A protein has these predicted regions:
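N-terminal amphipathic/basic-hydrophobic helices that include classical n-h-c signal peptides
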Residues: 1-10
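Core RNA-modification/binding signature centered on pseudouridine synthases
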Residues: 146-231
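Short amphipathic alpha-helices in soluble, non-transmembrane regions
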Residues: 89-99, 136-145, 200-202
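Ordered, amphipathic secondary-structure segments that act as subunit-interaction surfaces
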Residues: 73-126
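Short, charge-patterned binding micro-sites
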Residues: 49-79, 112-115
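Short beta-strand-to-loop capping motifs
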Residues: 19-21, 79-85, 125-131, 186-190
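Extended, well-folded interaction surfaces typified by the phenylalanyl-tRNA synthetase beta subunit core
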Residues: 13, 18-20, 24, 28, ...
Length: 231
């Protein structure tokens, strides 16, 4: 007698979840964000693939961690579904019902680019006058950006604090004076090779002008080295 063994085969379907991170959730660290998402995926009852081993958990990866306190409007995480026949709206609804209000899923797509291709990030930096008026803030910040070099102390993995010139890392910049703030859109290196945090420019401003400016930073988008938006 021949014993027939049947094996259930799943077709894993990678999908990219797009979400915003705002309000109180801006202050959730990347590690805590991972925990929040893990709980939401578990509660959502979505048919997703779990890692194997002693402690199986939903498989999820994030393209590029967002700095604490930053707002993100095009954040992504990748999961794997156990079936390639999925309903985008059902996934969005199921996750939003399990996530805190500061994290909002708005789209589900198939991954086009690998996270390792990310090389640039576009930030919106809003500066609010505190000890000086708006005109002076605008004048001072543009003066800072027009300097031949902008020297700051930056943490490195091997050498601790190191003085670097961040001026050459500005890929694009635009500064405008709004009704209540100075708005700066800045394209900076980001990804696995080089990362320049926009708060370094805030630190340079505060040190140069002995100020303690109020600011809000939003990451608007990330790109590959050809300037193509991450998809």
């Amino acid at each position: 007698m021949v014993q027939i063994v049947t094996v259930e085969v799943f077709v894993l379907k990678p999908v990219r979840i797009w979400f915003t991170k705002d309000n109180e959730c801006k202050y959730i660290s990347h590690l805590d964000l991972n925990r929040v998402v893990m709980r939401a995926l578990h509660k959502s009852k979505l048919n997703i693939w779990h890692t194997e081993g002693f402690n199986p958990h939903p498989f999820v990866t994030f393209a590029l961690p967002l700095s604490l306190g930053f707002k993100g409007v095009k954040e992504t995480m990748d999961i794997k579904l156990l079936d390639d026949d999925y309903n985008k709206e059902e996934i969005i609804s199921a996750l939003n019902n399990c996530l805190p209000s500061g994290i909002k899923v708005y789209d589900v797509t198939e991954p086009v680019m690998k996270a390792g291709k990310i090389a640039q990030a576009l930030f919106e930096i809003n500066l609010y006058p505190e000890t000086v008026d708006l005109d002076t803030l605008y004048s001072n910040f543009t003066e800072l950006l027009n300097q031949p070099e902008i020297l700051v102390m930056k943490k490195t993995k091997k050498k601790g604090l190191k003085e670097i010139d961040i001026k050459p890392h500005i890929l694009k910049v635009n500064v405008a004076k709004e009704d209540d703030c100075v708005k700066c859109n800045m394209l900076l290196p980001a990804g696995s090779t080089t990362n320049i945090n926009p708060t370094l420019f805030i630190n340079a401003y505060n040190e140069k002008y002995s100020d303690d400016v109020i600011y809000r930073i939003t990451r608007l988008d990330v790109f590959n080295d050809k300037g193509e938006s991450f998809k």
